[in-house]
Amino acid sequence: MVAAANPIAFDWRRATADDVFTLAALYRDAALRLGPLVYTPEQVRAWASFADDEPAFRHYVLHADTWIAERPGDGRMLGFCGVATEGDVREVHSLYVAPNCTRRGLGTEMLRRTLERADAEGATRFAAWVTPFSRPVFQAVGFALTQTVEAPFAGVMFERYRVERG
């Protein structure tokens, strides 16, 4: 289980089109600052480059039911989590935390709130393709590993994990 040493208080709201640019910056920052811990420089560049594809990133955020964690008072974005319905499964598309907020339970709490909202809407099955960073967070809320694959992203190979719950 992922433990929160210093839990971060946050406000929770649905993302809008006006948030896409700021979310892309948070995504890019996470990829560039955290990526080198587990990825090669080529993988880090590929991962971060997605934030620069404005139409694709906009779709990534707005196609899913994406929620934003903001610091109370000043509204600074701390992270975001998005889930979309794909058949009878709710697919978690995104879970990103600002690099200065990691290892404090924020990712786990954002994912938990996202799943609770979907549960309240009748969802019973969840799945996600996750990275080495997010896999422990998903496992902390009951997801189990079902598959490991090597898959290309922006022309670079990455190891990805399929996790499912329910």
In which residue ranges do the predicted regions lie?
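Conserved active-site tyrosine of GNAT-family acetyltransferases
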Residues: F138-Q139, F143
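Conserved catalytic-core motifs of GNAT/GCN5-like acyltransferases
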Residues: A127-W129, A144-R162
